From Swiss-Prot:
It comes from the Viruses. Keywords: Early protein, Host cytoplasm, Host nucleus, Host-virus interaction, Inhibition of host innate immune response by virus, Inhibition of host RLR pathway by virus, Membrane, Repeat, Transmembrane, Transmembrane helix, Viral immunoevasion. The keyword Signal does not apply. GO terms for molecular function: DNA binding. It comes from Variola virus. Belongs to the orthopoxvirus OPG067 family. Interacts with host CGAS; this interaction inhibits CGAS-mediated type I interferon response. Major early protein present in virus factories. The presence of BEN domains suggests a possible role in organization of viral DNA during replication or transcription. Plays an essential role in the inhibition of the cGAS-dependent type I IFN induction in host dendritic cells. Mechanistically, abolishes cGAMP production by triggering host CGAS degradation via a proteasome-dependent mechanism. The gene is OPG067. Induction: Expressed in the early phase of the viral replicative cycle. This is Protein OPG067.
């Protein structure tokens, strides 16, 4: 009978440890470790690369979102300063209108006739308003007519959105003017920020209720930005930057047309133009080189085949020249009727 002494026990432990070590390190004892046949290890190596790519994509996505939210917050902060300056300017303008005639100030203020028309229209809306929230909504209709067109892009806008990623904010600078007008009509030119926020929240509820009646038609939808490709990398980058500012293809068309045909819209001559010559109806054809630029920018962004995109793009160009919605004042009666109900 073997008597285990402390020395024997220590020797036994050392022998067993060496045997186990040799067994693990020996390729013949563990053939799965062979690199040529270790498919599991290879699989994990591939997954790690894919995982890294996914993480990079997520990181880029969140960085872009963070950048967008930061820019929105900066705009909101700038709008607060703008509100105070605009209010002082509005009060001075009202005093000037009361003490002088339009003829007297025509030479001193550029575009005074347009400003006077705007002032006259918004005053007419304010006079018949009985509710601050309805007045604010009516002024949104008046100041953002292009958002309430056939593409229903207003669906994606809010005054105080719960999510700055999901919804866009109406121009804070135009909202400042609306706030000043509401304050003047209902609050004797005084309205604290929390009260204005309550009014904005009520307007957002009205927008939500109206949004439930509509959807953005497929023809007005845009491709995801990562799927947009131009003729070159430079073109692709430029188009993506344009699309990033739009929510529908109609809005993209409008943005490009206002850049390329700015003089026509500024002078009012746009009324005489259409996509093609139309002698019978007295319309002049638009510059074909500029129209080609419109197609090159818009078509890659539409989620349809190029031939279909070309037809739709042409229709949107004609539609916009028939009724350019960015020109405010055309829907004055609609706004007055809304607040009068």
């Amino acid at each position: 009978m073997l008597i285990l002494t402390k020395v024997n026990i220590y020797m036994l432990i050392i022998v067993l440890w060496l045997y186990g070590y040799n067994f693990i390190m020996s390729g013949s004892q563990c053939p799965m470790i062979n690199d040529d046949r270790f498919t599991l290890k290879r699989k994990y190596q591939i997954d790690s690369v894919e995982s890294t790519m996914k993480m990079d994509k997520k990181r880029t996505k969140f960085q872009n979102r963070a950048k967008m939210v930061k820019e929105i917050n900066q705009t909101i902060r700038a709008a607060q300063t703008h509100y105070e300056t605009l209010k002082l300017g509005y009060i001075k303008f009202k005093k000037m209108i009361r003490t002088t005639t339009l003829e007297d100030i025509t030479t001193s203020i550029p575009n005074i006739q347009k400003i006077y028309k705007l002032f006259s229209d918004i005053s007419a809306i304010g006079k018949v308003s009985q509710n601050p929230s309805k007045m604010a909504y009516a002024l949104l209709l008046y100041m953002f007519p292009n958002l309430f067109g056939d593409d229903h892009r207003f669906i994606l806008y809010r005054m105080f959105p719960m999510s700055k990623i999901k919804h866009k904010i109406f121009s804070p600078f135009k909202l400042n003017l609306i706030r000043i007008l509401v304050e003047e009509r209902f609050y004797n030119n005084e309205c604290r920020s929390n009260k204005w926020r309550i009014i904005g929240t009520q307007v957002d509820k009205m927008l939500i209720a109206e949004s439930d009646k509509y959807t953005i038609d497929a023809r007005y939808r845009l491709r995801p930005i990562y799927r947009i490709k131009g003729k070159s990398e430079e073109d692709t980058l430029f188009i993506k930057q344009m699309v990033d500012q739009c929510v529908t293809s109609q809005e993209l068309v409008e943005k490009v047309l206002k850049i390329l045909f700015r003089d026509l819209f500024k002078s009012g001559e746009y009324k005489a133009y259409r996509y093609d010559d139309d002698v019978e109806n007295g319309f002049i054809g638009l510059d074909k080189l500029k129209l080609n630029i419109v197609h090159d920018i818009v078509e890659p962004c539409m989620p349809v085949r190029r031939p279909v995109a070309k037809i739709l793009c042409k229709e949107m160009v004609n539609k916009y020249f028939e009724n350019p919605l960015h020109i405010i004042g055309k829907n004055l009666q609609e706004c007055i009727d809304f607040v009068s109900e």
